[in-house]
């Protein structure tokens, strides 16, 4: 597995370009199980970054709806969704290799075959590898909220990102977001409502109840016990 999660970019004079990232690379130590999974299961389920469009039918060996999840953490929810929906294809992106290893291990243990994973910057993957109009759904669950005002620009949900996702969705495809930080939920709602080509799938034009398709994470369960809220947003690409 290539450990370069960001491709270097340069201006016309050869100077490195600085791009605002929505994540900080925190490489924790791999457990033996995670390393074993990367060594043995990555060749089957892993996808290396290349700056060229993916053939999604060839990647999965069939033509089926593709759900892309950005930042799957340790992968338990993603594996559960893939197992529950064998008629769909799932592609997960995560920049932290321990999470990728944990996801691969869980997928192997559950016998999941309709899942592929990447370890790279999701924005670059969307820009370079995902064909326009190819995705059934894009999922972004509990991204870093970047609480401090001076860091708000690092939030992944911004107008250019929403427009990028829109291009990659099929007509009628859905961008599903969830956050447990209300100011970020409000920010998401404001951004998404401003981008032409989306429709808010909430009857009240704000948030939706958690759909059954999104498993409740352990982190979320703990938050519920502490009285914390969670906000789900679903925006569809206008047909």
Swiss-Prot record:
Substrate binds at residues 148, 180, 217-220. The keyword S-adenosyl-L-methionine applies. Residues 150-155 are annotated as: Interaction with RNA. S-adenosyl-L-methionine binds at residues 69, 94, 121, 144. One of its GO terms (cellular component) is tRNA methyltransferase complex. The active site is at residue 144. Pathway: tRNA modification; N(7)-methylguanine-tRNA biosynthesis. It comes from the Bacteria. SUPFAM superfamilies: S-adenosyl-L-methionine-dependent methyltransferases. Keywords: Methyltransferase, S-adenosyl-L-methionine, Transferase, tRNA processing. One of its GO terms (molecular function) is tRNA (guanine(46)-N7)-methyltransferase activity. InterPro entries: SAM-dependent_MTases_sf, tRNA_(Gua-N-7)_MeTrfase_Trmb, tRNA_methyltr_TrmB_bact. PROSITE patterns: SAM_MT_TRMB. It catalyses: guanosine(46) in tRNA + S-adenosyl-L-methionine = N(7)-methylguanosine(46) in tRNA + S-adenosyl-L-homocysteine. Its EC number is 2.1.1.33. Pfam families: Methyltransf_4. Monomer. PANTHER family: 3-DEOXY-D-MANNO-OCTULOSONIC-ACID TRANSFERASE/TRNA GUANINE-N 7 - -METHYLTRANSFERASE, PENTACOTRIPEPTIDE-REPEAT REGION OF PRORP DOMAIN-CONTAINING PROTEIN. NCBIfam families: tRNA (guanosine(46)-N7)-methyltransferase TrmB (TIGR00091). Catalyzes the formation of N(7)-methylguanine at position 46 (m7G46) in tRNA. Belongs to the class I-like SAM-binding methyltransferase superfamily. TrmB family. This is tRNA (guanine-N(7)-)-methyltransferase. It comes from Cronobacter sakazakii (strain ATCC BAA-894). The gene is trmB.
């Amino acid at each position: 597995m290539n450990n370069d999660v960001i491709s270097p970019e340069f201006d016309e004079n050869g100077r490195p370009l600085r791009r605002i990232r929505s994540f900080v690379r925190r490489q924790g130590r791999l457990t033996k199980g995670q390393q074993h999974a990367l060594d043995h299961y990555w060749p089957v389920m892993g996808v290396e970054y290349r700056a060229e469009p993916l053939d999604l039918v060839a990647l999965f060996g069939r033509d089926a709806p593709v759900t892309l999840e950005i930042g799957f953490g340790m992968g338990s929810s993603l594996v559960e969704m893939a197992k529950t929906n064998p008629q769909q294809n799932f592609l997960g992106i995560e920049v932290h290799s321990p999470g990728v290893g944990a996801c691969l291990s869980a997928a192997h243990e559950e016998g999941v075959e309709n899942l592929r994973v990447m370890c790279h910057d999701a924005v670059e993957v969307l820009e370079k590898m995902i064909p326009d109009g190819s995705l059934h759904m894009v999922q972004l669950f509990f991204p870093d909220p970047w609480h401090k005002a001076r860091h708000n620009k690092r939030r992944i949900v911004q107008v250019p990102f929403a427009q990028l996702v829109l291009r990659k969705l099929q007509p009628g495809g859905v961008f599903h977001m969830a956050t447990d930080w209300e100011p970020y939920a409000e920010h998401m709602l404001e951004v998404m409502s401003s981008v032409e080509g989306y429709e808010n799938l909430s009857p009240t034009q704000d948030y939706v109840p958690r759909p059954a398709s999104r498993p409740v994470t352990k982190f979320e369960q703990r938050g519920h016990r502490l009285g914390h809220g969670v906000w789900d947003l679903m925006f569809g690409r206008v047909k």
